[in-house]
A protein has these predicted regions:
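Absolute protein N-terminus
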Residues: 1-4, 18-20
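Sec-dependent N-terminal signal peptides
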Residues: 3-14
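OB-fold and OB-like single-stranded nucleic-acid-recognition modules
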Residues: 19-144
């Protein structure tokens, strides 16, 4: 009986851990924007203002669940765009905001699949380079 309860507790713990990847997007959604003049562009742009919960994740290893956004010629890459939502609902299709996507650099190439996957890596924040996404996951590995 004791082993049964230990197995249940371990199962619940594993389930909570595996769900934590989807909670990461909820934290990353806590972002605001400020209008700031950009010299290069010659007009005001929206610059992200990261909340304290997001700032606490910077440089930390996080787990995130999401979808690979396919690009032409994609088979297996070490650099790709990752989304909280499937392709038909993602930021690039007009269905979500820029806080729902991130750039990813993996240690090993990840083969494309339409189903959600889980990645683990180090989160980098970007509020300066308007040619890049706000979030970047580096040294990432596919864990599920």
């Amino acid at each position: 009986m004791k082993h049964f309860f230990i197995a249940i507790i371990l199962g619940i713990s594993f389930n909570l851990f595996s769900q934590s990847g989807s909670n990461t997007w909820q934290i990353l959604a806590k972002i605001t924007y400020k209008k700031e003049y950009d010299e290069l562009m010659g007009f005001k742009i929206d610059k992200p203002v990261f909340s304290d919960p997001i700032k606490k994740l910077e440089g930390k290893e996080i787990t995130v669940k999401g979808y690979i956004i396919p690009v032409e010629g994609y088979k297996s890459h070490s650099e790709f765009i990752f989304s909280a939502f499937p392709y038909n609902m993602c930021f690039f299709c007009g269905g979500a905001g820029p806080e729902t996507v991130m750039e990813v650099e993996t240690i090993d190439p990840v083969k494309y699949q339409a189903e959600a996957i889980v990645l683990k890596g180090t989160l980098e924040l970007n509020s300066e380079d308007i040619n890049r996404l706000m979030f970047k996951l580096t040294n990432a590995k596919k864990v599920k």
